[in-house]
Amino acid sequence: MKRWLPIFLLILVLTDRVVVRAQTDAEVQARKDALDVAGAFSNDGFKIRDGHSCGLVKPHEHALVAVNLYAGNQYWFSAATAEPSKIAVSVYDETGKQVTTESYNNGEKAAAGFSPANSGQYLVSVDLVEGNGGSFCLVYSYK
């Protein structure tokens, strides 16, 4: 019993220090809109990957998300923002070179699709084209 007491106290202290940030209403709305866009690709056999990335997109800044992709798969990256603005989604390889993608842009919603020739880490960029910025959400689909 004496051995478990320090372990329990350590867990208690560590969990007390963990700060969990609750999602804002804007992030929830952006995720809903991003899932709506991704749902259109599921009609073509794409599976929506579990998880999502939310954050803030600001003028003249890129919101980057690192993803590991596999050669031979097809991917669609869908993003949305709750605030009235125009966004774009771009994909870059591990050297920072932009890859050629199919694009969908509709104001607050955007998507980029491609099939990587090589497996590895890629960067997905959500860019603010017009507007003052705000919360965004990114989800991706594969097949």
Where are the regions a protein language model picked out?
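Noncatalytic modules at the cell exterior or secretory-pathway interfaces
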Residues: 75, 114-132
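Short, surface-exposed beta-strand/strand-loop-strand elements in extracellular ectodomains
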Residues: 83-98
